[in-house]
Amino acid sequence: LYFAAFSTRKGTKTIPMRISGFTMIKNATKLYYPIRAAIESVLPICDEFVVALGDCDPDDKTYEEIQSIGSDKIRIIDTVWNLEKFPRGTENAHQTDIAKQACTGDWCFYVQADEVVHEKFLPVIKKRCEELLEHKEVDGLLFKYLHFWGDYNHYNDAHTWYTDEIRIVRNDPTIHSWWSAQSFRRIREFDGVSYRHKPGTEKLRVAPVDAYIYHYGFVRPPQYMQSKRKALHTIHWGKGKMESDFRDQTNEFDYGNLSKTKVFKGTHPAVMKDFISRFNWADKLRFDDKGGKNKSNLKHETLKNRIITFIEQNFFGGRQPFAYKNYKVIHPKVRK
């Protein structure tokens, strides 16, 4: 019984719990993704880390960046993206599934290329995995989020941002990435393509873990941010629509009025030190409402969302009681 919380049994052998880390990426260095920091941040508690590496552009150095970590835990799977077969962002989910299916651990820890875990949370995460290992009713773990915005000193907690998301799931072949790889669902009879087809899918039962994912998706030099937005637009809607929608926009993204975001007073993950040292676009940020050509793209600055955000933060303690949740939260009783 003692080992039940820390291991699985096969016959008379006791096998220690294993955690597999996994991610998918393409053109990380070209689009300013902190892929190395993302992997390194969870590597200490992972027994292996699987990367589905897409067919990057010739001027991209993602492979070299991952190899520079120098860990024999890392396993790279070379892939080719097919946006015709997997449109509307589902190639992201498909690539995530490729990496997940190659995992061998009891738990699969998913970090996207712009998501980093602070080292202070690693013991908490590992302990939570250990104590829930034999609670088979738990499909995964639900993490809290900090969405950094514009620079490393501000974060966005507006209604438009999700407060929690699934980032650890059991190594169950019926659990798949969902939609554009933001989350996961159980799909028992999966055709390998229909990542946006809801009928027949099941929300996962997840237990909260007292840990944050630090999301740096909107912390880039403005020109890189615009390039990333174009890449994501292409993945979701095709190159033609991307070119049409961005025709009248500038080459630099406008982060809007940063005085309307929250000031971050904590510390960043140690693995982000090098990436943060490259910060050189302070003169491109603003703290007023003068605006730029791309200001209309900022959903969190619309009157509707500002009102909803005010209500959530002042009457619900920051919770989003009416927001859509792609999971069912459960609270299993665990032995202390």
Residue ranges of predicted features:
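A structural signal for isolated positions on well-ordered beta-strands in alpha/beta enzyme cores
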Residues: 20-22, 48-50, 75
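N-terminal amphipathic/basic-hydrophobic helices that include classical n-h-c signal peptides
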Residues: 1-16
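N-proximal low-complexity "stem/linker" segments adjacent to membrane-targeting elements
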Residues: 15-40
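Short, acidic, metal-binding catalytic loop of nucleotide-sugar glycosyltransferases
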Residues: 38-49
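Catalytic-site signature of metal-activated, phosphate-bearing donor transferases
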Residues: 89-93, 97, 119-336
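Short aromatic/hydrophobic "clamp" motif used to bind/position activated sugar donors
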Residues: 108
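Active-site-proximal specificity loops/subdomain of glycosyltransferases
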Residues: 54, 58-105
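The conserved acidic donor/metal-binding loop of glycosyltransferases
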Residues: 112-116
